[in-house]
Amino acid sequence: MSPADTARPQLKIRSVALDTGRENVVVISRRSRALRPEVFSGFSRVELRCNSRTLLATLLITDDDALVGPDEIGLSEPALRRFAEPAGMLATVSPATPPESLEAVRAKIRGETLSDEAIAAVIEDLAHYRYSDMEIAAFLIGSASFMTSGELLALTHAMANAGTQLTWPEPVVVDKHCIGGIPGNRTSMVVVPIVAAHGLTIPKTSSRAITSPAGTADTMEVLARVNVGAEEMKSIVAACNGCVIWGGHVNLSPADDILISVERPLSLDTREQMVASILSKKLAAGSTHLLLDLPVGPTAKLTSGAEAMRLRKLFEFVGDRFGLKVEVITTDGRQPIGHGIGPVLEARDVMAVLGNEPQAPADLREKSLRLAAHLLEYDPKLRGGAGYSRARELLDSGAALKQMQKIIDAQGPSAGRSELGDLAFDVGAASDGVVSAIDCLRLNRLARTAGAPVNKGAGIRLYKKIGDRVDQGEPLYRVFTCDPSEHDLAAAAASANNGYVLDGPNGPH
């Protein structure tokens, strides 16, 4: 310890049960000898020191001695894990020196263009948890007003280099990604085994849901373990040609996960940030060829073809600069894909398609085949235009199902729930008519209100899609929940607006 540290009061580290998201938070008593009112106040940024370790954190002050005593300092779970010093050790707390890169954030807010070095410094500090959520929000808001093409390239590069970077022995490593927003749409879990069964390498790292009722990782977790590290991931891919795992456990572009955790509550979703987010992870994952699915629809993230075209050009521009072959396709985003919304229901859809079951959702099957066809065309040994027929052959023959089972076995069994919620209710049509529109955003919110994805058995089973005729009172869908309070909340939400528009004799209603 330095002489200054020796002079400061030492506090005993204590673990406190506080959910602070990703942010490092420490708690001290208002009666603590270390609390100097002229220096510290609630939400101050402080530096914690113990031996040679340091940690930047946000300070909370408590009057509850049961939480932390006057001679203790409480660390939230993320802070304790990152500090890597056990409870009971002695530490000092002092005012934190702000990261130098914060000057770049202030410059961006003033409307200045940042250098590559400035952006790299921001991402470096951000990835090492030196920023508070408020400081991250300042960077995001400053960047949302404008971002030059040079800044976008620098941001993508810095984010890709901030965490684990994977390499593969194969010359062609393919991947696919959908920008999201469409309920169901669990095509990756069908595409990966088709492509892997053909022999191409497809190491799929997926996200967990943030604002949707299920991410690919949440759905795969119904079937298999997804918390897989980088070395184990490489072993699985070597044995199976592919995997479907949670990217957060591999530490690909960790700064992106931090940015997303602050973006979503603020409803910040700029095109530049989306491109940097997606491509930084694909570059870090070692992909050489990427297929991007951009759904377009009235309640999708992209509402027009023109908007999709602008985003496509942005993806292609950045991909070209980093040597990543990016192919972008627009797809129908007017309604959900598949019968189910929520992890268990979506996993059942996937296995029904792979198993060629008669009741399998035809839209999920067809879209997955078309996406897989594009990826298979990257195989130089496959004749041009043969991708679709090869994908269908692998699916119809059962080869894709066999490959999926191989991937599931390699990743290991899941400890998650695989049963549907035992509380359910139907939502019926208010009148006779034909379904003319479905609000994807509202159904996503309803499934989350029902408990998904935290409760994997919660969700929605769809009975009707656009173009289907319904009679008054006929079920449009069934909502599954695992908790009585969530059941009541979901029932109230569905009663207020069921998300369906019907065309009848008197027009839409």
Swiss-Prot record:
Top-level class of the enzyme under EC nomenclature: transferase
PROSITE patterns cross-referenced by the UniProt entry: THYMID_PHOSPHORYLASE (PS00647)
Alphabetical keyword list: Glycosyltransferase, Transferase
Disulfide bond sites: none
Enzyme Commission number(s) of this protein: 2.4.2.4
Catalytic reaction(s) noted: thymidine + phosphate = 2-deoxy-alpha-D-ribose 1-phosphate + thymine
InterPro entries: Glycosyl_Trfase_fam3 (IPR000312), Glycosyl_Trfase_fam3_N_dom (IPR017459), Glycosyl_Trfase_fam3_N_dom_sf (IPR036320), Nuc_phospho_transferase (IPR035902), PYNP-like_C_sf (IPR036566), PYNP_C (IPR013102), Pyrmidine_PPase_CS (IPR017872), Thym_Pase_Put (IPR028579)
Assigned GO CC terms: cytosol
Claim: Cell membrane is one of the keywords in the record: no
Gene Ontology terms: biological process: pyrimidine nucleobase metabolic process; pyrimidine nucleoside metabolic process
A Pfam family annotated for this UniProt entry: PYNP_C
Gene3D superfamilies for this protein: 1.20.970.50, Nucleoside phosphorylase/phosphoribosyltransferase catalytic domain, Pyrimidine nucleoside phosphorylase-like, C-terminal domain
Family of this protein: Belongs to the thymidine/pyrimidine-nucleoside phosphorylase family. Type 2 subfamily.
Protein name (Swiss-Prot/TrEMBL): Putative thymidine phosphorylase
Annotated source species: Bradyrhizobium sp. (strain ORS 278)
Species lineage: Bacteria, Pseudomonadati, Pseudomonadota, Alphaproteobacteria, Hyphomicrobiales
